[in-house]
A protein has these predicted regions:
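Short, polar/acidic, helix-capping and beta-turn segments at strand->helix junctions
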Residues: 1-153
């Protein structure tokens, strides 16, 4: 078992098989030592999407969990990009988080903490940079979408 798998087991997290892209694009791309993960939606292991506007149909806590599910799907894509060897991953460089919300919503950062907190537990060496943006809508009416960049050895 590699170091990342040991950490995941310790915090009781399983990386899912990631969902297929919902459009005509690659789930990830690689440039030198960087892996760019396309936007990941909160699609659960049973194929359901957590949908709706945050603080209207989705609570803050549900949105945070959706962000965690989205970053787990990103980790699933990363695992494929690394031929199942997550020890190749040096760090998470950046997370871009998009929140489907009403105009007066301002807790975007709290929502995306659902993803950042998990990444910090796994890759505790370096914190990643991040942006949290509010949107009027997202693909498939998802409540959250997470895009990420990782560095590999």
């Amino acid at each position: 078992m590699n170091k990342i798998e040991e950490i995941l087991k310790k915090i009781n997290i399983t990386i899912p098989n990631p969902p297929k892209p919902v459009g005509n694009y690659a789930a990830f791309s690689r440039y030198e030592k960087l892996i760019f993960i396309s936007g990941q939606l909160p699609i659960t292991t049973d194929g359901k999407i957590i949908t709706g506007k945050v603080m209207k149909e989705v609570s803050l806590e549900q949105a945070q969990k959706a962000a965690e599910i989205s970053i787990l799907n990103a980790l699933g894509q990363l695992k494929i990009a690394c031929n199942s060897d997550l020890n190749k991953v040096k760090s998470c460089i950046r997370i871009s988080g998009y929140v489907n919300c009403l105009d007066n919503f301002s807790d975007h950062a709290k929502v995306i903490n659902g993803a950042s907190d998990l990444i910090a537990k796994i890759f505790s060496v370096n914190l990643h940079s991040r942006i949290a943006i509010g949107c009027n809508s997202l693909p498939l009416n998802a409540c959250v979408e997470i895009e990420s960049i990782f560095e590999i050895n």
